[in-house]
Amino acid sequence: MNMESIKNVIEIVKKPSNQFEYEEHYYFTGVNLGFNGTTIEMTGDVWEAAKFKDMTSNEAAAWCNFIKAILGKRYEINIKNISLTYNL
């Protein structure tokens, strides 16, 4: 999947603080994914976007792989308030 096919559900905002650091925010139906180059933090209504509470670990891992495919890089994903952490 490429960026063009998901641009209608994702908003990307880059806020350079200097030449080495940046932030990007991806919006999935009420869920905010923010990362700083090392960690992704998920906040918002996770149920609406990924239904993590009812997902099996395999399903949740598959969704995290979807996120990884979008980002095109390897990141640690910390799912806040759900107690799921996946190292991609």
Annotated model-derived regions:
Residues 48-88:
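Short, mixed-charge low-complexity intrinsically disordered segments
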